Amino acid sequence: MNKNYMKIKRCLDESVFAQIDNLKYMQNLRDNIETYDEKKINEFFDSLMEYILLNNIDIKFKRFVVFWIDYIIQNYSVKINNSLRKKVNDIIITLDIYPLLYDKNYCKNNIKYFNLFDEISIKIREKNNKLLSNVQYYARNKILERKNIVFSAPTSFGKSSIVIDTIKELIYCNKIKKVLFILPTKALINEYRRKIKENIEDIIIIENPHVTTDFSKVIYLFTPERFLVFYENNKNVKIDYVINDEAQILVNINKKKCVGRSILLAKILSIISESKTPIIFLLPYVSKPFDTFIFKYINIDREDVIQISDDMLPFVSNNYYMLDVDENGDLFKYDFSKDAGLEFANKKYIATSNCSFNKNSLEDWSNIIIDNITKIINIEKKFIVFCTSKNQIKTIAQRLIKNRICKIDNISYRMQALINYIENNIGLEFELITFLKNGIAVHFSEIDSYIRRQIEIIFNEENDIKGMVCTSTLLQGVNLNAQNLIMIYGNRFSAIGNVDIDFRNLVGRSARLGINIQGNIYNIAYNKKIEKEGERLYTSSDPVKINFDKIIKEVKKNPNEIVKTYALDSQVRSKLKDELNMGNDSSIENLDYFIGSESAKKVEKKISEKDIDYYVDLLKNIGNYEKTLLLIQELSQIYEWEKNPDFDVSKRMKNIEYIARLAVNVFNGESIRTMINKNINFVQKNKDYSLVVCKNIMGSEYVRIVHKKNIDFTNMHIFVRERDINTYIYTMLYDVQKIIEFYLKKYIQDLYYRIKRINKDTIKEVEEILDYSTKDKKKISLNNIGIVDNFAISLLTREEFSEFYDFNENIKIDKLKEYAYSLPEYDPLRYAILDVI
């Protein structure tokens, strides 16, 4: 039974609140019970400043103050009079939350409200058009000193911006020349490339691990996998500084989906720490990350590491709400915004469900929320709906359209360019077009680089997309900023890695410095305990505490092959390896980490049983259908795909002919639309084959080509274009990104390096396919300057664009830029170029 209110663990003692004037008025103003009263608000901030000056205040009180400063700036900045503005400024300076002075809603003509001392202090802190707090300034100075740094801070603290800005200073002063960024995903690499290009002019950025040129000044952007390949060929290259973003990946060695990447990063850190290269770790707000887990990975003395983490005061804040539905179908919210000084989470009526409601049905929860979303949030402000599956994403998006929630009157040029791109390259029938035209975007792992980038830019910078519906894949991309976040999930939060870190990472999407300094977070009761979930929300601004010893114990009980590879590697010297204690050291090659040392031995035995020249011939002719087909057949046998526990490898990839055709099409730069039409035509011409719709072990539908002979059509249905085309588009997007770009390339790469180890020969054709999915020199040149979208690469390598290349087939960047600016603003090619160079 629903309660009318629930007790909250108050952020401060009653004796403290007794000294704050008009707190109840401020709380009522926030609830729209009171109206704006200049006198009362001035008295409230007077009492805050008085308390700050007369007491030793702790982090809890500071958060309370930040909450109300964020509230007043975000909601009433245009009404703030001179007297109140000066008081707010004084508090901001006293609490060292300087960046708020430059908030877009607040900074206009602000300088005249400072005294001379404050003006000098502000001038000193102003770096790269940003105003730094003491902590940020300290971090900057330690980077300038090229220290080892562990920088853990809340979302929107500006960690990556501080690093890029300071690295820029070091490069321009010739203090450093070669910088390495280790980043977990290609999406983050693309985002970093964009940020670096905006800040550091004329710097060479390299993503290709096979580059051997020793540049005088260069920034390398690598995933862990790519760094190992680079290191294999460039062991003598001296790196001046290393930055590892998303370093929390290191705690995921007990997560089945994450352990491979975690151990690859662990191996890299072992290499870097042995070289004595200074390193910066960036990660979300974790309590003492160096002392709890990072120190176990690197061979660096504690006194040589600067740790910036605990008691970090965020500049932004959130309102937290739990949504519940009672037995009468009435939708309520409970306000758990602890930092507002609330003592009780009061129950507030929102609306009544128009149909029957099952509290254990996520579909019913989605329906009642979407049907009443205008009563829950201010729909003029951007929102994100987080859910657990791609099917749920589509259902929610379709209901938003049905209710005309996000209808937009005008479409920006960039949005029109995105729609044009989808129509030409993905398919006219793709439902994402309908979503976008109705002001809604969906975000899932299979969307290609162009769609992902445009959606993220439009959502952050334009007004076309008001709502975003996503799964946990949002956590792997760049920061998307929305004032409102609604979470619709069942009993358990669906995390990629550590649950507490991922949960806080998601919550951090709502409040962002310079955009929305105070956000609104909504979670559903489902059949969870509301008090417990409410507490989880209002403690999400606290640092995560990691029990890494417990994680190590879990790993030791059932270590997988990659963990064993690390634990037995004679080249690794780390406390983690010592604690894993899995036997005598052995000589392990760096590239054995891709499949594990035991699997590597089996693979090399199989390779030795055939003529090496046979494999070399297949690899050199990769892209030719017959040779690619033979190569994939060999890979399936060498790596025993049928025994692989991964459904995609053991089931989806056993159709060798389909995988070969798909791979050749990808390597030739074919669009999704073209590949789908080719497959449909293939089945129509070859009566022995059928296109069918199946379900995977998770119940999600996908389309596949099957040979009619010996196929049981139970649990399948024949593909009908009008009904199943969207399923096919999603399937093809998935197959390209996951089956070809991830799995197939992984096995091609491993085979190639084992062959190369034997005959010492470089096969450029393979390296180019692995890095660029092409062997065309012009396409590779485009890729090297950051143009990664296949449609743009295919267009720009046509004969009519030869003027953009020099005699070595390198890009004339200025000429290409000039051409891009001449294109219509609704042309997708314009943004494929200008977004990255």
Predicted feature locations:
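Conserved C-terminal RecA-like helicase domain
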Residues: 110-123, 130, 134-141, 150-157, ...
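Structural recognition of the conserved hydrophobic beta-strand(s) that form the central parallel beta-sheet
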Residues: 181, 220-223, 243, 278-284, ...
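Walker B catalytic acidic pair
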Residues: 224, 245-247, 489
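Conserved interdomain linker/interface between the two RecA-like ATPase lobes of SF2 helicase motors
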Residues: 270, 277-399, 441
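Conserved segment of the helicase C-terminal RecA-like domain
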Residues: 273-280, 480, 492-493, 499-541
